[in-house]
Curated annotation (Swiss-Prot):
It comes from the Bacteria. Pathway: Cell wall biogenesis; peptidoglycan biosynthesis. It comes from Desulfotalea psychrophila (strain LSv54 / DSM 12343). One of its GO terms (molecular function) is ATP binding. GO terms for biological process: cell division; cell wall organization; peptidoglycan biosynthetic process; regulation of cell shape. This is UDP-N-acetylmuramoylalanine--D-glutamate ligase. The keyword Cell division applies. It holds the Pfam family Mur_ligase_M. One of its GO terms (cellular component) is cytoplasm. It catalyses: UDP-N-acetyl-alpha-D-muramoyl-L-alanine + D-glutamate + ATP = UDP-N-acetyl-alpha-D-muramoyl-L-alanyl-D-glutamate + ADP + phosphate + H(+).
Length: 456
């Protein structure tokens, strides 16, 4: 049986904007309360109706297809907004009309009765969320891992499954409408320009991220990068105890090459990352706060060390694809902003970089230092090619390719023994691909075709 939620009951007219992954989860959740349901979606009527029948069966759901209108949505008492919806003017108008506007985190907040770990940042949040989940499971805890990755939080609430800890990846889009969401442990990994097409500028993007801390109390824990000036700014923080992690001497969770350490229960604990998938600069910075979180939730040090040793990285994040004639090929398709690309380049020495795609408003001049220090050839693809060329052509040799296949072929022709060919786009994928996973899979196929040709 669903826990009572002050935002929804049988007398509520509950609307959902956008029937994507989060919207479907919201509909499944709302069906359990017997509310009057409205759905507004951009897809055509036939496709939307098929989705509603599949999800709601015989339950009557009023809907509008082909867009979102004030006239339809203003009937609602409460509106659930999917993270991808960006019409702030419409939402403001609905609020003025007395409609409550909520995101997933705000809707779930009143009924969360287990410790919640919420992880955000421009880069690394998926890896760290997965790692925290693995470390907690290694200690025998029942864990839900989801949010912006995998299973939506509302599906956990619908299921009634009992867990000990909830671990969530949360995005800036979700945090904009977080309401009274208050995680017991909140982690901000890093901040660099991203989604500026949505947030307007870096200040707007940072403000969305800082919602993570605003409702925390004195018994909660806030963990932020001690190396990132944007994370260190205290404005927007709540009342939680704050811990810094990183290479900085001021860090409470101290990171160094191949290991990290922190004080716990009066003892200095040292954790080695040697021979693990996390033994690189990015991995050190990911593992340190993850282990501190697990330790803060009463996991044993030995269990944490076992979880770190067993951890494997997800696809499309600095994923080794092949070694061909002494050249290493890496798929980093998940790198959709400049910060992620810089992090990838810092792990390599002589790089042929494939970058480009759909621009998200990023400043590609931020890549100049890392490109000058690590990249000997840049191959640009996609709509952002002119922007990348303008920002970088005076610090690196630049080529243009009309397809990813052409880019891989060019990279292979330029590469010499000891080089690395890296797909790390700094852009969204939607100009040429279905998503970043599709882009990464196509890159992998092209590279493996090179390997097949070379073996004949």
């Amino acid at each position: 049986m669903l826990k009572k939620n002050p935002y929804i009951d049988a007398h509520t007219t509950f609307a959902i904007i956008g029937l994507g992954v989060s919207g479907k989860a919201a509909l499944r959740y709302a069906l359990g309360f017997g509310a009057h349901l409205l759905v507004s979606d951009r897809r055509d009527e036939e496709a939307l109706l098929a989705q509603l029948v599949a999800l709601a069966g015989d339950v009557v759901v009023d809907y509008e297809a082909g867009g979102h209108t004030f006239q339809f949505l203003s009937q609602a008492d409460v509106i659930f907004v999917s993270p991808g919806f960006a019409d702030g003017e419409l939402l403001a108008r609905l609020r003025r009309a007395g409609v409550q506007v909520l995101g997933e985190l705000a809707l779930a907040a009143p009924v969360l009765d287990r410790p919640v770990v919420a992880i955000t940042g421009t880069n690394g949040k998926t890896t760290v969320t997965s790692l925290v989940g693995d470390l907690l499971r290694a200690s025998g805890k029942r864990v839900f891992v989801g949010g912006n990755i995998g299973v939506p939080l509302l599906d956990l609430l619908s299921s009634g499954d009992e867990v000990d800890v909830i671990v969530l990846e949360v995005s800036s889009f979700q945090l904009e409408l977080a309401g009274d969401f208050s995680p017991h442990i909140a982690l901000l990994l890093n901040l660099s320009p991203d989604h500026l097409d949505r947030h307007g500028d870096l200040a707007g993007y940072r403000a969305a991220k800082m919602h993570l801390f605003q409702k925390q109390g004195m018994t909660d824990i806030a963990i932020v990068s001690g190396d990132d000036p944007l994370c260190l700014l205290s404005d927007g923080c709540g009342e939680a105890s704050r811990y810094l992690f990183g290479f900085s001497a001021a860090s409470d969770i101290s990171v160094a090459a191949g290991h990290f350490e922190f004080d716990f229960a009066g003892q200095r604990e040292i954790y080695s990352l040697r021979d693990s998938a996390l033994d690189n600069r990015t991995g050190w910075l990911n593992a340190a706060p993850a282990a501190f979180i697990a330790r803060s939730l009463a996991c044993a040090k030995a269990d944490i060390e076992r979880g770190i040793a067993a951890f494997t990285l997800d696809a499309h994040r600095m994923e080794p694809v092949a070694s061909i004639a002494g050249v290493q090929y890496y798929n980093d398709s998940k790198a959709t902003n400049t910060g992620a690309v810089i992090s990838a380049l810092q792990q390599l020495v002589r790089v042929i970089l494939i970058a480009g795609g759909r621009d998200k408003g990023d400043n590609y001049r931020l890549l100049r230092e890392a490109v000058a220090g690590h990249v000997r050839t840049l191959i640009c693809i996609g709509e952002a090619t002119p922007l990348l060329v303008a920002a970088l052509e005076d610090v690196v040799q630049v080529y243009r390719a009309t397809s990813l296949a052409e880019a891989v072929s060019l990279a292979a022709s330029f590469a010499e023994e000891g080089d690395s060919v890296l797909l790390s786009p700094a852009c969204a994928s939607f100009d040429m691909f279905a998503n970043y996973q599709d882009r990464g899979e196509q890159f992998r196929r092209q590279v493996l075709q090179l390997q097949d040709v070379g073996s004949k």
